[in-house]
Amino acid sequence: MWLEGSPLAVLAAVSFLLSVLAAAQGSGEYCHGWLDAQAVWRDGFQCPERFDGDDSTICCGKCELRYCCSSAEARLDQGVCNNDRQQGAPDHNRPDKDSPDSTAVPIYVPFLIVGSVFVAFIIVGSLVAICCCRCLRPKQEPQQSRAPGSNRLMETIPMISSASTSRGSSSRQSSTAASSSSSANSGARPPPTRSQTNCCLPEGAMNNVYVNMPTNFSVLNCQQATQLVQHQGQYLHPQFVGYAVPHDSVPMTPVPQFIDGLQGGYRQMQSPYPHSNPEQMMYPAVTV
């Protein structure tokens, strides 16, 4: 944490030094008031004065004559001077130097205090922000890790709803198809076409082998089918050899009405499945 906050601390320290230097350059030393050689009181002033350069921030000269300059060698030590004590205060209406009210405060001191407080506020705020970021970062990582799972869950919900919608539409389509097929079955059916599975088999062999032929007989070659018929025909029971397979279409019988059509408010119901002829003979299948 301190390594991450070190650039901010360095930046704050540099800004503090620049503010101090700017305050020092803008307001130099304060030359206290003094009595000149003619015993005339001279008021104190802040360096630099109006007619001095920006670099004249040092109080120079002698105790009897003070001025602002930029040379550190010519600096005046005002602590050793004793002519800055005002004499004849009632005449000039000026307090004495030793009195509490005569303490001269440099002008740059308030600016220095304000600048130091501002820089300290920046440093403290930066440290608090770094600590908060370090403390809250582990709590945000699990939330980000859980975010893809929630996104996948949100993605699956529309898929489920679309699947249920498609199932509902398919069920409606199937019911519509069933109703249309039932209405179509009410009419007469055309006779079914004869399958061409017996493409190259004689009729006598087909009549004898019809009861024990597999369902996928059509995929066999004609020569192989003939051999299979001749081979299986030897094992047929003599009791079922004379039976023939009916190839004619099954006659349709009229469907009885389940609800009387004379009653008001009801439609005539028709059975979707045709009734089989009870007189049709059923031949049992024989497997060897």
From Swiss-Prot:
GO terms for biological process: negative regulation of fibroblast growth factor receptor signaling pathway; negative regulation of Wnt signaling pathway. Residues 1-23 form the signal peptide. Residues 24-110 are extracellular. It is a single-pass type I membrane protein. It is found in: Endoplasmic reticulum membrane. Interacts with fzd8 and fgfr1. This is Protein shisa-2. The lineage of its organism: Eukaryota, Metazoa, Chordata, Craniata, Vertebrata. The gene is shisa2.
